[in-house]
């Protein structure tokens, strides 16, 4: 699945739900350049809200609420169904410590070494 160009997320999630076992979106997207800040953008269907996620991690895990239970709800008289939420988690590649191909992209931090990564979430309304 290629999200290099804007896509309607609902269509992608419905396609995945019909095609694959995970019943929605649950993917790790590898970013092209480990030194760049590659933004992830979500824009509401009415173009009134935009979320931009910037990070210098090498990948981003994106998943929808594929298996939401309808109970309990955090808000009285509101039930949530599948795909009512989305999560965007910049980070290292999943299971990289056990995958030699990914070792360079997922360094092991040793005692005394510095760790310097950032994640920025920016919300805009129009």
Model region roles, listed by residue range:
Residues 2-126:
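Active-site pocket scaffolds in enzymes
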């Amino acid at each position: 699945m290629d999200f290099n160009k804007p896509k309607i997320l609902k269509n992608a999630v419905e396609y995945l739900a019909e095609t694959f076992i995970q019943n929605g979106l649950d993917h790790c997207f590898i970013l092209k350049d480990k030194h760049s800040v590659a933004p992830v953008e979500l824009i509401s269907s009415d173009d009134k809200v935009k979320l931009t996620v910037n990070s210098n991690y090498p990948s981003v895990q994106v998943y929808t609420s594929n298996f939401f239970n309808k109970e309990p709800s955090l808000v009285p008289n509101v039930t949530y169904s599948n795909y009512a939420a989305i999560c965007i988690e910049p980070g290292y590649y999943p299971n990289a410590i056990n995958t030699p191909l990914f070792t360079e992209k997922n360094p092991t931090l040793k005692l005394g070494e510095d760790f310097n990564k950032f994640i920025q979430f920016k919300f805009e309304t129009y």
